[in-house]
Amino acid sequence: MSKIKLLMIVFLFAGCSVPDFMIQGQLDDFEIALEAEDVNWIMDQYTDDVVRELPDGFKFKGKDEVRMYWEDLFQSVDNIDVEAIDFVTSGFPPAKLALHWRWKADVVAKAKYFKFDTVGTTIKIEGMDLTYGSGFKTARVITFWNTLDMLQQAGYKVTK
């Protein structure tokens, strides 16, 4: 059986389009890299002039700054479990990707790029990444999560 016929059969049984199938594979690889704390693999997915924005006003420009963010994050958490819940893309190769994700990790040290101390807790959050691509690389990521929920899990009391 030819490879093309085999791919068509796989896509039909998978119930998704070719781009969705390819994106899901890339997201699976990204989950594996996050859980393995593989900074080099993650950095290979970015353009040289990547911009990454986090809640609370943190903005990283270029691979060097983004690498520092990932290294700091991986030094501050253990037992990472991440899951891509859903996504939608635009274009092929994808010019835009909206990703809904779930993250769980044990916080073992204070992160440089998070304003609050949550050391000693296990944080479970859901968030959203808006990703803009350039070819098959990521050029910009804007991340959203609920900081208030994270702080409440860490035992902070929120008052007016």
Report residues per predicted region.
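Short, well-ordered alpha-helical segments enriched in acidic and aromatic residues
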Residues: 26, 36-53
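A short gly/proline-enriched turn/hairpin at secondary-structure junctions
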Residues: 45, 49-61, 73-77
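Solvent-exposed, acidic/flexible segments
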Residues: 20-23, 35, 59, 63
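Sec-dependent signal peptide recognition
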Residues: 2-9
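Amphipathic alpha-helical repeat scaffolds
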Residues: 24, 28-32
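Hydrophobic h-region of N-terminal signal peptides that target proteins for export
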Residues: 10-17
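A beta-strand edge to alpha-helix "cap/lid" segment located at domain peripheries
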Residues: 17-22, 53, 67, 71-160
